[in-house]
């Protein structure tokens, strides 16, 4: 009986030891595009191995990611809405935002291109033609970085899209693409998600190259001043990793069918120390 009890105790201690050695879990809220294109599966495992931790990825739109971060329910965010990111930091919710990478947005449309926008480099004019012809347009409609950019373009075009022709998916980018494809409509999408799904779509690329379609991504640790429980040191270690020359090269060489999905943009600057308390 004593030997049996000793065995049970030892097994329990071993179990606790194994559980404790599993390391910390870092909570990362990020865009559906970085998740759906497989980029995170490409760049995160080396960090997890080096730091003996697990990164729990929450894939949502940028607006939702920021809301989760404001609530203190994640440790760090990787998002793509620069103005909103800067406001997020200015309001004390995040610290030490760093550039990570960029690509651009493009507009896809039906092969027949009923709006007649194929080849134009003016995104504002393209949306004006779509609206004037009441051609089907599918929006993310979810306050994501893509949706924020789309709303910016409608504002630039002096239009408020509404009516049966304007559909809101309220879903991630890949799901929105599928909906637009089914409806044979127009849609705005980040280039990486388009390239990742291109072979499954009937829609064709019709608008690209407008500077306003630039799409930068940034990483922001949640403020430990606002939420003392967050894993700030591990978050900053992740910032250091994704902006390091090694990871930046991994980002820059990540391809789909020979085409680069993202362009690194961190440069060689080291991550900053914790900003002064606001």
Segments from the language model and where they lie:
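Acidic, polar ligand-binding/catalytic clefts
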Residues: 76-102
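Positively charged n-region of N-terminal signal peptides that target proteins for export
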Residues: 1-4
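Exported/periplasmic ABC-transporter solute-binding proteins
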Residues: 22-54, 63, 67-73, 81-82, ...
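Serine endopeptidase catalytic core focused on the charge-relay Asp
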Residues: 107
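Bacterial N-terminal signal peptides
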Residues: 6-17
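Short, conserved active-site loops that position catalytic residues or coordinate cofactors/metal ions
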Residues: 72, 103-104
């Amino acid at each position: 009986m004593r030997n049996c009890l000793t065995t049970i105790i030892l097994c329990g201690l071993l179990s606790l030891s194994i559980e404790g050695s599993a390391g910390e879990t870092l909570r990362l809220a990020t865009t559906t595009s970085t998740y759906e294109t497989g980029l995170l599966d490409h760049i995160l495992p080396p960090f997890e191995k080096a730091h003996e931790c697990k990164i729990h990825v929450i894939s949502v739109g940028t607006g939702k990611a920021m809301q989760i971060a404001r609530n203190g329910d994640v440790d760090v965010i990787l998002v793509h809405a620069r103005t909103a990111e800067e406001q997020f930091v200015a309001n004390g919710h995040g610290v030490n935002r760093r550039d990570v990478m960029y690509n651009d947005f493009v507009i896809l449309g039906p092969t027949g291109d009923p709006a007649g926008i194929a080849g134009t480099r003016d995104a504002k004019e393209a949306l004006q033609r779509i609206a004037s012809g009441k051609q089907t347009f599918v929006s993310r409609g979810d306050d994501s970085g893509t949706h924020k950019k789309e709303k910016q373009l409608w504002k630039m075009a002096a239009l408020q899209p509404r009516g049966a022709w304007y559909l809101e998916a309220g879903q991630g980018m890949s799901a929105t693409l599928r909906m637009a494809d089914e409806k044979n409509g127009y849609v705005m999408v980040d280039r990486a998600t388009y390239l990742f799904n291109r072979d499954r779509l009937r829609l064709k690329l019709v608008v690209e190259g407008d500077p306003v379609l630039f799409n930068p991504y940034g990483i922001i640790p949640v403020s430990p001043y606002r939420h003392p429980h967050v894993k700030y040191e591990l978050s900053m270690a992740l910032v250091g990793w994704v902006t390091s020359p090694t990871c930046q090269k991994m980002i820059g060489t990540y391809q789909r069918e020979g085409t680069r999905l993202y362009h690194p943009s961190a440069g060689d600057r080291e991550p900053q120390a914790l900003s002064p308390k606001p």
